[in-house]
Design a protein with these regions (language model features):
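A membrane-periplasm/extracellular boundary helix in multi-pass inner-membrane enzymes
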Residues: 134, 224-273, 294-296
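Alpha-helical transmembrane segments of multi-pass inner-membrane proteins
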Residues: 113-141, 160-223
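Aromatic-anchored transmembrane helix interface
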Residues: 59-68, 79-104, 114-115, 120
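Helix-loop-helix junctions and helix-breaking kinks within/between transmembrane helices
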Residues: 22-35, 83-85, 163-169, 191-226, ...
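Transmembrane signal-anchor hairpin modules in multi-pass inner-membrane enzymes, especially those
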Residues: 1-80, 110, 114, 182-188, ...
Length: 421
């Protein structure tokens, strides 16, 4: 077997292992055990090539080391019943970073990202079916649970295989980015998959994802817009095709797609003003956090250890309706949670990682699609986890770690290329 084909085949297998991890996580029957399926990559790549961490990998590693130390020092302040979960998550952080390093050091990055985009498009097709039926088909088949809100109603939000709607939204953003930068050769299928991802994002109804798209679009325009009159033929053809489809839907089925989309977006954002809606809860938990930190400077600076946010929420729950609604389950903001757990010191490590992604996106060569793609994907995740605790889900931390590792490998390849030249 030619060496190049062998690398490509192994890359497909490596992505299949990652996909299996995502699928098994949604079963919700094995706790966090699905992460162990990632060790299958050692069957694909039995020879481990050790090397130095890149900047983003090092940032994640130092964050994991620091929060582990803080957790050990504050073990007595842990909320009863969360001790085991805290240490399990910390162990999984290190496993994710190690596995991401091994995977990124062996796969063909371009093929791996193309696999993400293609499979993401196929999953989005499944998501559209789910959205039409307003029933979590795949989630129910995998987990046997019907714990998704608003089943059978107009407010239903698709989850596909990702456990919760807001988590699904983050993955859909990553799929969209990979699909845009790494299309398949079949143009018609490529357009259908791209449209499917966009429709799935709309059916997912996650405001965090929509905001992430807006932010990424601004960054993209800053990097790529030259403000000239050069016309790209493909863009013109795709634009005409989209307008034709919209016109056809309006005339034949009397479906005004643009108006429907605008109405859906307005409804989702206006709904956040209702008491008890996620955004109102987030605002109050943030306000309460600042009140708490004023009297607890040590926690603000250094944190109280993994899951310390649960301790805080027991003291400062969000109460609505004179006590009829009490929320103390989660802060629903990863950055505020990081401060509670590891202080401004821990937050500095994570911000270093995400700002490195932004810097690389802005400074990398426009023709280096792999680097642009992975850094955009990291920025997308950095945006959506502002609205929930993504680091409490090992398969999300793993996915972010893989993207960070791929970004580091892209930098290394560029440096090697420059040394040769």
């Amino acid at each position: 077997m030619p060496k190049e084909k062998k690398i490509i085949d192994k890359t497909h297998l490596a992505f299949a292992v990652l996909l299996l991890t995502w699928v098994l996580t949604d079963t919700q029957r094995f706790g966090n055990i699905p992460l162990l399926t990632m060790f299958l990559i050692f069957l694909i790549y039995p020879k481990i090539r050790l090397g130095k961490f890149g900047k983003m990998e090092l940032g994640l590693f130092l964050y994991s080391v620091y929060i582990s130390i803080v957790t050990l020092l504050n073990i007595k302040t842990q909320l009863s019943g969360y001790e085991a979960n805290s240490f399990l998550l910390l162990i999984e952080y290190f496993l994710c970073i190690f596995l991401a390093f091994i995977l990124s050091s062996n796969v063909d990055i371009l093929i791996f990202l193309k696999d993400i985009g293609f499979v993401g498009g196929m999953l989005s097709v499944f998501g559209i079916v789910e959205g039409v039926l307003r029933f979590p088909i795949y989630h129910y088949l995998l987990s046997g649970k019907l714990n998704i809100p608003d089943i059978g109603t107009n407010d239903y939000r698709i989850v596909i295989i990702f456990a919760y709607p807001i988590i699904c939204g983050g993955f859909l953003i990553m799929f969209l980015i990979c699909k845009l930068f790494f299309p398949i050769k079949n143009n018609l299928l490529n357009i259908l998959l791209l449209v499917s991802i966009i429709e799935a994002i709309l059916m997912n109804k996650s405001r965090s994802s929509w905001l992430a798209i807006a932010f990424l679009l601004i960054l993209y325009l800053i990097k790529y817009t030259k403000f000239n009159l050069k016309i790209n033929k493909k863009v013109v053809i795709y634009t005409i095709f989209i307008f034709f489809v919209l016109f056809f839907l309006k005339i034949i089925f009397n479906v005004d797609v643009v108006s429907n989309i605008a109405s859906e977006i307005i409804d989702r954002f206006s709904g956040s003003l209702n008491a008890g809606e996620g955004q109102i809860i987030r605002i109050e938990t943030v306000q309460n956090s600042f009140i708490y930190w004023k009297d607890n400077i040590r926690i603000l600076l250094f944190g109280g250890g993994k899951n310390y946010d649960k301790v805080f929420l027991q003291m400062y729950p969000v109460i609505k309706g004179g006590g009829s609604f009490v929320w103390n389950g989660a802060i629903d903001n990863e950055y505020i949670t990081i401060i509670h757990e590891s202080g401004l010191v821990g937050l500095a490590f994570i911000l270093f990682v995400f700002f490195t992604a932004i810097k690389r996106f802005i400074t990398c060569d426009k023709c280096d699609k792999s680097s642009v793609c992975v850094n955009m994907a990291v920025i997308g995740w950095a945006t959506v986890i502002y609205f929930y605790e993504g680091f409490n889900y090992p398969f999300i931390f793993l996915t972010i770690a893989i993207l960070c590792s791929l970004s580091d490998r892209c930098v290394e390849k560029e440096q090697q290329k420059n040394e040769i030249n």
